[in-house]
Structure formats: C-alpha cells, structure tokens
Amino acid sequence: MPRKHFIFLIFLFWKFDSAESISVTSKNATEALLRCPPAENFIRTHMAPDFETPRLVRRLDWFQDDSLVASYQQDILADSSRQWWVSDGRYQLIRPFYTLRVSPVTPEDSGTYRCRLETDPLFSSPQSTATQELAVMVKPVAPSSPEIKTFTNRSITLVWTHNAARAHRPILRFSVSVRTVSDNTRFVMAAPSNATTVIVDNLSPYTLYAFSVRAENSAGSSDFGPETTFRTLGESPNRPPQIQKIRNITSECVEVTITPPDEMNGELDKYLVLIQAVNETIPRKMTFDKPTSTPLTICALSPSTDYALAIEADNGFGTSPQATLVFHTEDSVPNWSPSTITTLPVVGKPEITVLWPAPPLNATEKVIKYHLYYKAKNEDQWKIEHLNVSPNGVKSKLFKYRLVDLNPNTQYRIRVSASTIKGEGAQSADSVAQTDVGEPGTVTFKDLNFDCKNGVKLRWNYEPSVNSKKSPTFTVKVTNQTTSLQFNTTMLSLDIIDLSLYDEYTLRIIVLERSTIDNSTILIGKYSDSHQFILKDKCSYQSSFCSPGEKCAKLTSSAGNPRYISVLIVIFAIIIFAFICFVIVHFARGSMNFKHLLKKKEKCVYLEEISPLVYDSAGQEDIPVELFYGYVEDLNRNDSLKFKTQFQILESQTSGIDSVDSGESNSSSDENSQKNRYNNIGAIEATRIRLNSPTGNDYINANYVDSCNERNAYIATQAPLPSTFSDFWSMIWQERSNIIVCITNMVEDGKRKCDQYWPSQQDSPQTFGNYQVTLVSESTNAHFSHRILDLKIAKAVPAVERKVHQLHFMGWPDHGVPSSVFPLLSFVHYTSDIHSTGPVVVHCSAGVGRSGSYILVDSMRRHLISFRRLNVQGHLTHMRRQRAKLVQTLEQYIFCHEAIRQLIRHGITRVHSDLFMRYLHYLSEENLNGKTRMQLQFEDICDCKHQPRCLIESDVITLPGYHRSDEFMVGSWGNECEDLWRLTWQQKVQTIVILNQRDSFWRKLPSCIYDGEIQLQHGDNFVLLQKDDQQLCVRIVNVSRADLDTDFWREIENVQKQRITYHDAPLLILAHKYPPSVPSPTDSTSTLSLSILFNDDTALAFSICAATTLACQLETTGCVDVVQVLSSYTEIQCGIFASKQEIEIIYEKMSQLVGGTRV
C-alpha cells in the first residue's frame, strides 16, 4: 500500500513554576521538540559557556501523563552512555538543554508532558518542574450527508452536521461538491467560513444533482462524505422546439419531425399543436401526449392548401415559445364530380358543346385537366377528350368544350371528370345529347341527255348524311353569259327546257337540308363541281361529261388566264431575288473575324479557337494548353498517384490557414461562432467580408476569393442559417452582387444542408431584417433552377430595387462529385451569360468543397479566353489562402481537372443559335490526322471503349430530357405485353409513341392483367387502364420512318401536341429491336436519311429523345448544348450511339431547326 503522509499540527502549552506559558508549533509534523524551560534557564545561568561544565544537573525526567518516557541521571552508572534513557526509540533527549524530541509524532502522543529538574543541592532551587500540553492534529473525518432545507428551480439550501474530535479542531472551512448525475460533471464550492450551511445557485432546472461535503483543517481535507441526490424544480422551456422536416404522406395528412428544445428544463410531456389554414380565422388545437422520436402525424387537412403550423413543447411546468412553419398540403384526387352538365348540340355540325360549372367553393384541389367521356348510343367503348386548365390562371366560373368529328344525327352519352396531378376523380352522371345532321354534302353528276330540241335531262347522285331521316332539297343553277336559271327539286333528276343552241351553259347543284335540332334552320351545303355543255343541231352537243350512245363531244376547259401566269412569273422573280440577297449576306458575314465573334460575352462560343489561360504562381508548374490533356492523363496513372501527391502538398501548404486570426478574431468569439453552420468552418480574418452593421458586429462567414486576373471576383460563403438571413442579404446589397450560385440541395442524406432564404411563391415578398425579397420568376430544368429575385430595402423612401439572379445547381452531392462534368460546364456557361455588377456569390453548405470547385473551374474558364498556359494547383493554393479548405477532397480536385480538360478539348459546347451554323462548320473541319472535330467528339464522348462492345440488353431505358431527369423511356417490346402496361401504370405514362407499328403489335391481351388488378380497354387511339376506382388514359401516337424522313420536326411537334401531360409525365417510345449489328465508324452517307442510317428502331428513338431535349433547350434559352445531351445518354448506357453518323444526324436536325442548312 502506498504510504499515507499525515500532516500534524502540534500545539505546545507550557506551564512551569514561574507561571510562564510558551506554545510551540511544528508545521511539517515530522517531529515535536519539547523544551524544558527550567533546565534551560538553569544551565544558561549557572554553567560555563559550553553548557557542559560544571556538571550541576543531577537528574532530569520527562513524563507523559505521569508516565516516564525519558530520563537523565548523572551518577546512576559509571558508564556515562547509560546515563540517558528513553522508553521508545521515537524519543530522544537533546543536549545541552535536555529538550525532548518526538519523531515521528502520532495521535497517541497527545497529552500533558512534564519535565522535572534536579540540580546540585548548593543552589537555591534544588528542584524545578514545568508542564505543557501536546496536541497532534489529524485530517478531519467526512461530514454527514447534507440535508435539503429549501430549494427552487435553480438553487438549493444545504445543511449538514460534523462531529469533530479534539484532534480535528479547529475546522477552517467546509466545501460542497455539486455533481450532475446525467453527465457526471461536477464543481466544488466553499461554504462561507466554517458554517454548516450553504446556498448553491446557478443550477439548471429539472436536473438531478448529487451533493456531498468535505471538511478542511490545517492538517488537510477529508474525503467527500456520502452524497444526497436531489432534482431541481422544472420550468417552462425557454427555447422553441425545432421542426426538422415536414412531409406530405397523403393529401390530408402530413408527417412532422420535431426535436425538443435544446434546454428542455424538464421531461417532455406533450406537444401542443396549433394549425390553421390561411383562409380560416380560428386555429385547430391538437395535443400529442408522451411524444417519442417518431414523427407526429396531423390529419384531417384540406388538400392543396396553405397551412400555418405552430408547435409548443410542454414539460408539465409550462410551454415553450412557438416553432412556426408555413407548409402546403399535397394535392389529391378530386372527391367530387362535375355537376349540372349542360350539352348543347351545334346547329349544322355533328358537334356538341359541353358546359359544366367550376369546382365547388369548398374544393381545394387544383384541377389541371378535365376528361370528357362520350360514346354513341350503339357503341360499346367510351372515347375520351381532355381539357387542360391552368391551376394558377384566371378562375373561370364555367368550363366549355366542344366535341367534334361526331356522327351526325346520333344520340350521345357524355360524362365529365376532373383530374389533379394525383389522378382522376369520379365521373359525373351521364348527360344525353343528339347531334345535328351536319352540313349537307355535294352531288356528283351522273349523266346529261339532250332531247334534240332545246332541252336536256339532268341526273345526279347524292349520298345523304348518316342517320339523316329527312329528304334534302336540291337547287340547280343553270347560267350562260346572259341569263341565270334556278330550279328546286327533291328528286335526283331534272328536265331543263327552253335552252338556246350554241350557247355555253354552266351547271351547279347545291344541297339544302333542314336541321334536326332547329326546325327553322335550313342547312346549305357546298356547290358541286361546275359542268359545261353546248347544245347544237342534229342532236349533237358538247359537254364536260357525255353519256354513252349520245352524239356528244367532250368539252375541254379553256387555257389558263394569262393574268394568273403573269402573277406567277412576278412571284417567282421575287423569290429568286430574295435568294440571291441571302447568299450575298451569308458570305459577307462569313468573311468576318470568327474569333472576334467568339469573344463576345453574350454569345456561346467554342473555346478551342481561343488562346486559353496561364496563371503565374511561384513554385508551381505552368502547363501549356496543348499539353494539358496528356498532363491530366499522367496524373491519373497508377491509381491517381500524382494527383494524391499534389493534393497532399496542397494540404500541407495550406494546413494552418483555417486557424488564421489576428489577436481577438471576430470569428473566434462566441457570438460569431453561433453564426457558423459548422464549428470547424469559419471565415479567414484577412479576407472576410465586413458588414456595415449598425449593431457593431460586422461578422459573416464569407470571404473574398480572387480569380486569376481579378481581385475579389467571387465571394465564397456558407449556406445562410435562419439567424443569418438578414446578414446574407445585407452582404448582397453592400457588395452590389447580382448573381448567387447555390450548389446544394436543401436536404441531403436526411440532413439539413441549406435553409431556404428566398420566397417560395411569386409576388409573396418576405422580409429579412431591413431587406425585402420577392420572387419574380423561376425556371427549372433537369439540372438547375434560375430564379430572378427583387431585392430592396424594406422601408426605404424612395424604394430602390435590384434584380438578383439565383442559379441553383441541384446535381452535386455533398463531399462527392457529379457523374459527368458536362452538366456543370453547361451551368457555368449559362451563369457567365448574365452580366455581373459585383462579386459572384457562391455557396454550397459549408462554402468550401463544392463552392471552391465551382470557383476554380469558372476562374480557369475566364482565363482560357486570353491565355494559353494554366496552373490549376498554383491558383488553388492562392484561393485556399483566402478561404480555407476550398476544393475540400481529392475527388473534387480530380473532378476540377477533368472539367478543365474537357473544357479545353471540346470548348464551350453551349452554343447560341446565332452561332450554331458556324459551330457546325467548325466541327466539320479536319485536323492533321484527317479526322473531323465531330469524329473526335464522337470518339471521346460516345464511342464504346470496351471489348466486346457494350450492347443494350434492357427492355426499357430511362433517359433525361430538358425538363426532367426521367423525361423519356425507350422500350424495345416488339409486341403488346403485360410488362409494358405494368410499367405504364407504375410510371403513370400517359403518352406512348410507337415507331413503325407492325400489324402484329397488338396481341389483344385479356381485359385483366397484372394479377387481375389492372383492367385494359383499347380504343382507336388510346388505351384506358383502370384499377379499382383509379383510371389512367394513355394516348397512342404512331410515327413512321417515312414521315420522319419527310418532315422530322413536323412529326416531333405533332408528338408534343398530343402528349396528354406534356413534361409532367414520362414519354414512352416503343421501338423494335433488331438483331445487333455494329456499324463501322467510318460508314457515311451523303443524305443522312433516317431509313438508311438507322437499321435499328431503338437508335432512332434515342435520337428522337436527344433532338426533342435540344429543341426544348433552344426554345427556352436560345442555346443548344449537344455534347451535354450526348454525354448524359452515354453515362446511362455505354454505346447508346454506335457511330458518328448517329450524332451527325442530331446536328443536322438542329441545324434545320435554327433555320440553317447542312454545312
């Protein structure tokens, strides 16, 4: 066992004959020296200076409580060494004054000590004694466990008792240990003086504490005594709970994920929820008792409605402040059907106008489409038409739709249903209507017989309207140069007399029918074709049609009118003149400096024609543009060994930058650290943005970052926190920035990465501090969103507004990289087309990894326009000295090099429509190896590098479009099958395009498939799928190769017009897959005919998808990026484009669309 060192404090109280009292203290407690004053005074008075002679002391004894412990006797023995005696080895008499030394002392040594002195009888005081008290002090024992006297929610009064023995007194002080039981943290506080009570304050509410006491004296401290545990009173939480996520689970229910307040001040007992629709006046109250970590489910909500949600946490002692959120419930299938269907047959046409009222006032669903089902009385299958409506458009009180191409004079049953984005609601009751007979048709002349005098017998044929039950009336007009005769008849023949010989007559017949809807209305048809005849003598005549056996000569029409020929000649001459002017202007523009055009910022250019960048950075290697492609390949060798080495050097050179501050750095203060989204990511002091804040706190987690040739070209910052929204917009206003680049999603992997600092709805401004932000417009495609925001000072007079562009790229994962560089490059080029008025603000979540990658790539892009050398590593080192950890991972560092490499190799592939023909001409030029740039583009992006070559084995491939990442699906089913309709139902496909439909495609499947759950109903151009009470109407569009060859874009436009939901649902293209064959990459055709080029319908389908995507991009942005589409398709399926000709046809079709011809 280790030695225990006791510290003894020794008090000596002397008492001798002269009544003198002396006290002696030994602080180290290793020994006690007890003086004998009578002996000392005697020796000093009567003996020589050496205190040894003459020997006048005859005897001296030391007693402890009357027990002899040490003695000196002068004449007891002849042996002088035996004249000294002690009872214990710890005792020792010290000459010359006979001081008693006790070493070491123990608590048993305490008591009354007495020295007795015997001297020579010649002296006046032959005997003298002195007494003293020796007290040995030890560390005290621990006090008892404290008792609770009074308490509150944040303080407690303790009292205790302490039985101290004589060896323990005096007690100098008591100390109290306060331990938090939950995390075992503790602190010690001293009681005032040596009182046995103390008030412990500054405690946390509703917290279990353990209290114990120790005593302290001059010898030391006791151990802490037994603990007393006690829980303080609770109080209402002082912070609101946090709403982590809200999710629509149905149209009437939401799921809210809540975390309790950070300082609960008690056990969570329940959540109090207040929810109120925006158009309601009284909120609905809900209580969730004993909540757990599982989300709360709130139901009985109205679909497609904005709700205000407030949640309070209750711990039994009170409620917390409210956590508030505004959310929008999901739309639902309408639970109502259109009522009061009115059908109005159209007079004179086999058409019916259908009228129905708007949804009920209590209906909250946003109707996007109405479906009209109709069928004739004798038909079995329903036909369907659709009326698209805008949910955000002008609210109409009455809807109208006209059914056309109906059978005349036929009774129809009509139903109407409404659809939201979630599906179709119930159908209305049948409404019955009868169509009119329709416009009368025309007659066809049968024969004309001459009576050899002055009359003719005319006969004709007429096919009456279907279901027409009334006899028509025929009006026959006979005219010559001087007279006009008109005859009415209900017969199919007419005798005409009193005609002149040798006059040319013209015959025309019109049909009249009475409307079956309105008996007072006469329907007038169109005149028949004109026929001429001339009567002559001897029973002969000329006619435009002759009856057999008659003396009739065929009457031919006269030559064309010279006036019309003159007009045609003039029109032809104008066309020739316009064509010559176009050719002159075209070649005149071609002589302009192409490179000068490419340098215009507002145009999309192809970069390889320009000299790229150099960045002069000491100690780093400058790479010529011509060698950069091979330089990156070299870095990639041996599992990217050189990349790893470079990145390690970069990390070592910038490893200490993240801790840079000067003196008392603002970023290190408690107030500023609360403004950081992540504890380890702050703003470097030297380059941070300093806000002009009236509060005096100028900190925001943002830094200036230079481009290669411009200081403070960018601002890299974190995603703003709700508490820093006002600081963020203050920075935008202060720095006059009008471009915000956001490269993160709101939530990633279930974690909040960014809080929404802009309004969700247009014309619904939100105020952040002193600034008001309004969403002006928002456009979204498959990769990013472009929002235009209106920023102004909220209460400024007069109001000053600024337009701010927010570009939100959504395809970059946190700590990762996109699968392809081309969507990012296209996004960078799109952003660069916007004129900036200040630094470009870039943020992801922390503002270092993805933000740094974007800034690095865009900085290289800017300088590649003017320089032909670049230094990526050197510039990134410079950037990291301005904001720590930019380009955070090795994977991002490699990705930036790959993006710059592809930028150099393929240039700016997002080409403006004005420059597309020149760009196409540029691709057709050959290099020194005899290959065109288009061929190199195909080999680099599309060509399959694997052996054997990759083949498409899946029955269906999902491809991205301009609007969605799953906009197209290409299936290779050669026949109708259950898998086809199962996919259609699961993906909610509403339009199917069949390429080159074969007669054997439709197999007439049974009416029930998919385990009997889905019912099929085939129509003329649609298939109706039904499951329970849900229906899905799928329009079938047939497209042939011949039609595509004749007019490609007319067929594409026709497909787009017939899409039921346009881009809201995938477009499924069915193409027959033929046995695989790999065309030679050098095969070529001068006409690029679709029939010759594509020996497989699936390849044609892929090109249709790509062309449609590019057409949408051209229509929306005025630019085309073919490379981005090719790379995204190849990323999904290697070898999807088998030859250069397949991408050449895409360029060919895009050139037609922008108004050019093939170069």
Curated annotation (Swiss-Prot):
Spans within the Cytoplasmic topological domain: 586-1159
Topological domain ranges for the Extracellular compartment: 22-564
Glycosylation sites: N28, N153, N194, N248, N279, N362, N480, N488, N519
Span of domain Fibronectin type-III: 142-235, 240-335, 337-438, 439-538
EC number: 3.1.3.48
Residue pairs linked by disulfide bridges in the UniProt entry: C36-C115
Residue stretches making up the Ig-like C2-type domain: 22-135
Signal peptide bounds: 1-21
GO biological process, one term: neuron projection development
Biased composition (Low complexity): 658-671
Family assignment from sequence similarity: Belongs to the protein-tyrosine phosphatase family. Receptor class subfamily.
Protein name, per record: Tyrosine-protein phosphatase 4
Biological source species: Caenorhabditis elegans
